[in-house]
Design a protein with these regions (language model features):
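Transmembrane alpha-helices
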Residues: 20-21, 30-33, 173-179, 183-185, ...
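C-terminal transmembrane helix and the adjacent membrane-cytosol boundary/short C-terminal tail
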Residues: 2-9, 17, 177-192, 196-207, ...
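Short membrane-interfacial helix/loop motifs at transmembrane-helix boundaries
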Residues: 3, 31-81, 236-238
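Membrane-interfacial helix termini and adjacent extracytoplasmic/periplasmic loops
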Residues: 4-8, 50-58, 82, 121-123, ...
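N-terminal signal-anchor/first transmembrane alpha helix
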Residues: 1-39
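Interhelical loop and adjacent transmembrane-helix boundary motif
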Residues: 6-15, 60-77, 226-283
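Non-cytoplasmic
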Residues: 41-49, 142, 146-147, 164, ...
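Transmembrane-helix boundary motif in ABC transporter permease subunits
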Residues: 2-11, 94-129, 142, 146, ...
Length: 293
């Protein structure tokens, strides 16, 4: 929004006050990243900006916390070298990828069903599907623990995958439903009139048009699973340790800059995934003929 050429004094004050306010909010949100990033390269075992570090002295900068994260031990380590960070990384990707695949499949099918005209109880079904986004996570985690305990799948990868699938499905439903808005059903009729069966119509006509929404929803589902800690604490065990759980345990048991190294990697991963989502959103708008602003 640009300031009008003939803006009054009050409009100018409101405009620049608006920019100042949101600039401060943005700084408040982004400032921790600028603290975590440099400290992850510090040689000090404490979360501090030493005089040598601020003077850019070579001995004050180090990659040892990244080596500790990768379980590459050395004699200069002042903390216990452990493989929990690598095990947590492997488990997080394992749980995240499988739960994302399941959530993407279920969410896409649900969105296609809800997009059909004259769908009965559409609002009720939609409310149930997106309820994991609305209900407080601690309540969802407690309910999952009680339900999974009766099924005997707590403290297992199966329980965590199912739990993260439930948390990720709403994101897929919402993004695919938004992509299907304005979808021309005449394309389906034209495909069927040319002799294509249901499966061929789906993969050759529908899927290419909704693919940006599907991938965006899948990325959001993966980020949700990768960054989730509350459900892991309820449903998982020591064997199912993930990166967020290891970071939480590290803050409680052993304050180590290795946590900052992992946080820096997670920030980089999040930026890459969100950039991909934005590129897919723009591609989807081009396919749907929406003018870029």
């Amino acid at each position: 929004m640009k300031l009008p050429v003939y803006a009054t004094t009050g409009q100018k004050i409101g405009y620049y006050g608006f920019l100042t306010y949101f600039g401060l909010v943005f700084f408040f949100l982004i400032a921790p990243i600028f603290v975590v990033l440099p400290l992850s390269f510090s040689s000090s075992p404490f979360f501090e900006f030493t005089r040598e570090f601020m003077s850019f002295e070579p001995e004050a900068w180090s990659l040892k916390w990244y080596r500790n994260m990768l379980n590459i031990c050395s004699v200069e380590m002042t903390t216990v070298c452990t493989d929990k960070w690598m095990r947590g990384t492997v488990n997080s990707f394992y749980i995240g990828i499988i739960s994302t695949l399941i959530a993407t499949t279920l969410g896409t099918l649900a969105a296609l069903g809800l997009s059909r005209p004259h769908m009965p109880f559409r609002a009720l079904i939609m409310a149930i599907l997106i309820s994991p986004m609305i209900v407080p996570l601690i309540i969802t985690a407690a309910g999952m623990f009680l339900f999974y305990s009766k099924l005997g799948i707590t403290h297992s990868f199966t329980g965590l995958i199912l739990a993260h699938t439930a948390l990720g499905t709403p994101f897929v439903v919402i993004t695919v439903t938004a992509t299907l808005t304005g979808f021309d059903n005449n394309l389906i009729r034209a495909s069927q009139s040319l002799g294509a069966d249901t499966m061929r119509t789906f993969f050759k006509v529908i899927m290419p048009l909704i693919l940006p929404g599907v991938v965006s929803g899948a990325l959001f589902a993966f980020i949700t699973s990768f960054d989730e800690v509350v459900v892991v604490l309820f449903v998982g065990s020591v064997e199912q340790i993930t990166i967020p759980r290891q970071m939480w345990a590290g803050l409680r048991q052993e304050i180590s800059p290795t946590i900052l190294s992992m946080a820096t990697c997670l920030v980089a991963l999040s930026i890459a995934l969100l950039t991909t989502v934005e590129l897919l959103r723009r591609r989807s708008e081009r396919l749907r003929g929406i003018k870029q602003r």
